[in-house]
Each structure stands twice: as C-alpha cells, then as structure tokens.
Amino acid sequence: MDLIGLLKSQFLCHLVFCYVFIASGLIVNAIQLCTLVIWPINKQLFRKINARLCYCVSSQLVMLLEWWSGTECTIYTDPKACPHYGKENAIVVLNHKFEIDFLCGWSLAERLGILGNSKVLAKKELAYVPIIGWMWYFVEMIFCTRKWEQDRQTVAKSLLHLRDYPEKYLFLIHCEGTRFTEKKHQISMQVAQAKGLPSLKHHLLPRTKGFAITVKCLRDVVPAVYDCTLNFRNNENPTLLGVLNGKKYHADCYVRRIPMEDIPEDEDKCSAWLHKLYQEKDAFQEEYYRTGVFPETPWVPPRRPWSLVNWLFWASLLLYPFFQFLVSMVSSGSSVTLASLVLIFCMASMGVRWMIGVTEIDKGSAYGNIDNKRKQTD
C-alpha cells in the first residue's frame, strides 16, 4: 500500500469526513425544517431551496466516490441519446446487486447536473435514518411499506405531486424490490417457475406493480425510461466502507433510453413489458461477464468540481471550531472530560457504522426471503 493509500485508510481521516457529514447534515436538516413555512406561500420556491440543500448533503458522498476513492464510471449508451441526458425528466430502472449502486446513480446524476433533484422509490424504514432519511422527506421522496394494499393509494398520491415539479429530475426505482443475494435469487426463481416466467440468472423477479403505477402517474411529464444495468470490472465487490477507505473501483453501466410511448399503458401489458426488459438486462449481464464490456459506445461524462467545492466549504466552516473544541478538551486535563470525549467518539463511530450498515448486503432486509415465500403459497 502506498503512502496516500495508507493515509486514506486512517481513522483520523474517517473521523474528519464523518464529522463534516454529520454536522453539516444536521445543519441542513434544521434549515429544511425552517423552510416549511415557505410551502404554503410558494411551493415551487420551497422545492428549489430544498433541492439545493439536498445537494449539500448527497454531494458529499459523491465526493467520496469520485474524488476520495477515485472510482471511475463508464457509461455505455447510444450517442444519439446523450443530448437528452440531464435535459429531461426520466424514470430510471437500475439493477440492485451492489452496496454502492445507489452511489453510482448519484454520481451519474451529479455529472448530468441534476443530483439535487434525484428522486427514488424507497422503503419506508429509510425515512427514519438520520440526515439522509430526514433530508429525503423534504425533497418529496416516495416511501413505501412494500405491502401493495397499503401502498397503492399512498404511492400514487405522492407520485402525482411530482407532476408539477419545477425542475428536471431522475426518478429511480429498483424493480426487484430488494438487493440481490443468492438466497433471495433462489426463492425468486421458484416464484418465477410457479408463474411460468423465464428464469433470470443475475436478477430477481421484478415487482411490476410499483413500476406500472409510476409509469401511469408520470407518463405525461416523463418522456423516457432509462434502463440502467450496472456491473463492476474484474468481479469487484464494492462497499461503502471500501469507498471510505479510499479504494478505487471501476464501474460500467449500460444505459438505454426508452421513449415513454414505447411502454404499454395497460397494466397487464406494462407488467409483461417489464418482465421482458429484465430478460434483456439478464442477457446484457451475461454478455458482460463473458466479454467484460456492454454493448454500445463507451462515454465518460466529465467530472464536475462542485461536489468537492461543497465539501471544502463545509470542512472550512466546521473543522476549525471542532479542533478548537478538541484542544480545549484535551488541555483541560480532566479525566472525566477525556472519558466523555472518548465516549462521544465511540458513539459517533457506532452511529456512522450503523448508517453504513444500512447499505451492506449481508445486513439487508429479509423482504425478498419472506415475501416471495408468501407469494409462492398464495
């Protein structure tokens, strides 16, 4: 390991990043709370302000990926589609196999200039995650319980609110419903066999109802669906902890722009269309594992400096008083004070580790394990 790599793996560096992220995130959450008074007066202004506040937080994670770890992401796409990216609303269908797939999606959104307006259909539990979950509440993220009887009306109502959103956005949906694991895949393919559907090798069976209602509610304001198939070179197994340690990964993403008029309006036909899409995605993944590349032309959108500038702003604002506080605590010489300081560090470290654990595959939800079994017996 070289000197820079050794430095990136040190706890002190991680402490700095975590402190800046937590402190700035809580400040942003507090400001977002104050902006609630704007909503009844000017809803569109409220949305624009909160999109910028959201960027202040989410771009810090993009900075870690792009500038700290140096992870590269190559897009494979039709060159004719490139002028549309970042210039239109779109529904993004992304495979859900890697711990940092969401971060790669954010990186793409940042390079297209619409990170602050990125939306996602997320499980309701994430709304309670400090900083990120609280931030998402103010930017109208769509939360679901993953119980269709409860979600049918609430998700549709939330989606309809986005029809008059004032700026361009990407709406991400993981149609598989949960992150891929071998156990979930085995159960999912049992369901596919019971329903007479073709087996998938690299994906779980897609949940079609959430996609169908998203298309139905946003069809008139979203001109295209972006089918994104993500993988990593050399069988890399990327983790958020690896990114924090400065480990460099190499992501490849195949993006297909599918015009909305090509997607059936009928719910049953839309569901069949989505199943066919995932069969195609599976074939693309199989080809990638065989050849190491996706179809179409490789394209690397230029890295923008603003995520780094944003982090440097927060670091310069927060680190000086932080180090002043540390010096005063250490110089006090009080054993109680020092013990309290150590306790604070331990609690902060545990809190950050818990937030990182939300992304870890082996600590993911049991949704795909339990719910699929129930469906198979229905």
Swiss-Prot record:
Keywords: Acyltransferase, Endoplasmic reticulum, Lipid biosynthesis, Lipid metabolism, Membrane, Phospholipid biosynthesis, Phospholipid metabolism, Transferase, Transmembrane, Transmembrane helix
Membrane topology according to the record: Multi-pass membrane protein
Expression tissues: Expressed at a high levels in the brain, at intermediate or low levels in skeletal muscles, gut, kidney, spleen and lung. Barely detectable in heart and liver.
Cellular compartments annotated: Endoplasmic reticulum membrane
Keyword Lipid metabolism among UniProt keywords: yes
Entry GO terms, CC: endoplasmic reticulum; endoplasmic reticulum membrane; mitochondrial outer membrane
Assigned EC number: 2.3.1.51
GO biological process, any: phospholipid metabolic process
Pathway membership, UniProt: Phospholipid metabolism; CDP-diacylglycerol biosynthesis; CDP-diacylglycerol from sn-glycerol 3-phosphate: step 2/3
Catalytic activity: a 1-acyl-sn-glycero-3-phosphate + an acyl-CoA = a 1,2-diacyl-sn-glycero-3-phosphate + CoA; (4Z,7Z,10Z,13Z,16Z,19Z)-docosahexaenoyl-CoA + 1-hexadecanoyl-sn-glycero-3-phosphate = 1-hexadecanoyl-2-(4Z,7Z,10Z,13Z,16Z,19Z-docosahexaenoyl)-sn-glycero-3-phosphate + CoA; 1-octadecanoyl-sn-glycero-3-phosphate + (9Z,12Z)-octadecadienoyl-CoA = 1-octadecanoyl-2-(9Z,12Z-octadecadienoyl)-sn-glycero-3-phosphate + CoA; 1-octadecanoyl-sn-glycero-3-phosphate + (4Z,7Z,10Z,13Z,16Z,19Z)-docosahexaenoyl-CoA = 1-octadecanoyl-2-(4Z,7Z,10Z,13Z,16Z,19Z-docosahexaenoyl)-sn-glycero-3-phosphate + CoA
InterPro entries: Acyltransf_C, Plipid/glycerol_acylTrfase
TM annotation in the entry: 11-31, 125-145, 311-331, 338-358
MF term (GO), any: 1-acylglycerol-3-phosphate O-acyltransferase activity
Motif HXXXXD motif: chain residues: 96-101
Family indicated by similarity: Belongs to the 1-acyl-sn-glycerol-3-phosphate acyltransferase family.
Role: Converts 1-acyl-sn-glycerol-3-phosphate (lysophosphatidic acid or LPA) into 1,2-diacyl-sn-glycerol-3-phosphate (phosphatidic acid or PA) by incorporating an acyl moiety at the sn-2 position of the glycerol backbone. Exhibits high acyl-CoA specificity for polyunsaturated fatty acyl-CoA, especially docosahexaenoyl-CoA (22:6-CoA, DHA-CoA).
Domain notes: The HXXXXD motif is essential for acyltransferase activity and may constitute the binding site for the phosphate moiety of the glycerol-3-phosphate.
Protein name: 1-acyl-sn-glycerol-3-phosphate acyltransferase delta
Organism: Mus musculus (Mouse)
